[in-house]
Each structure stands twice: as structure tokens, then as C-alpha cells.
Amino acid sequence: MLFKQIRIGKNGVPFTIYKLRTIPEGATIPNAWGAFLRKSKLDELPQLLNVLKGEMTLVGPRPDVPGYADLLQGDDRIILTLKPGITGLASLKYRNEEQLLAQQPNPKQYNDEVIWPDKVRINKWYASNRTFLIDLQIIFYTLVPIPFDVDAF
């Protein structure tokens, strides 16, 4: 029932991230239960194992799949100085990322040209400005999904 995937962690070190499987073996889309798990973000709960292992924190930039972290250049690499988090500012802004991408004629291109660069911008800001209070606010807005402007941080 666990889905494992390699992600890039602090200092660019790969690690195995854990999630609840939302797409049945051999299928290409989630079933109703999987869709519920994704929408509610409950599929992320096994990442508490990653937190206990010291690979992740509760709040921080989401860990990228290999390939994207390699694209970080110059001061963008400040993101890699942090442990990745289960939730973060970019996660909040793009909490409906799947639906947003599904509306695009070329989802990968939209991700690469619009979403990912914006996530880098947000995560750089977080890396330079994070505080305990900001982390508490991020946790609050993760648990209580009310609208707010991430860019107001």
C-alpha cells in the first residue's frame, strides 16, 4: 500500500519518500479512494516516517524528483540547504496543482515554464526568511484550507 519514490533532499542527497499508493497497480489514474487520498493530502501521511528518519521536516520546500533539483543554479541552490518538508508555502499556493495542470494543453511545459519557476521563487524566499512563526502559519493554513495570498508573506 506504500508508494516509494526517489526524491532529492538536503544538499542534493537522494532519499526514498513514502506516500500512500493512490493509483492501483497497472492503472494510469487514481480510483475513487486514491482521488480522495490525494485531494485530502492524506496520501502524504507516511512522510512522517521520513521526518522521523531525519530526511524531512514538517515545513520546508517540497522535495523534487531527480532532474529538477539539477536545474537549480546560483542563488536558487539555497533551497537545497534546507531539509525538504511535508508542506510549505509553494505547496499551499499550488495545493490544486493537479487540477491546474489538467486544464493545460501541455501540462509538462506549463509546469516547467510557470509552476516550477514560481515554486523556486517562493522556496528561495522561504529559505531566506523562515521563522518559527512563519512555520506555524504554514502548518495552520495546511490544516485549515482557507484562501490566503502566499505572495503576501
Task: For every predicted segment, state its role.
Residues 1-36, 90-116:
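Short, glycine-rich, amphipathic interfacial segments at transmembrane boundaries or analogous
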Residues 41, 79-81, 103-104, 112-116, ...:
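Short, surface-exposed linear patches
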Residues 115-126:
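Short helix/strand-capping connector loops at secondary-structure junctions
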Residues 27-90, 139:
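A short, structured surface patch at a secondary-structure boundary
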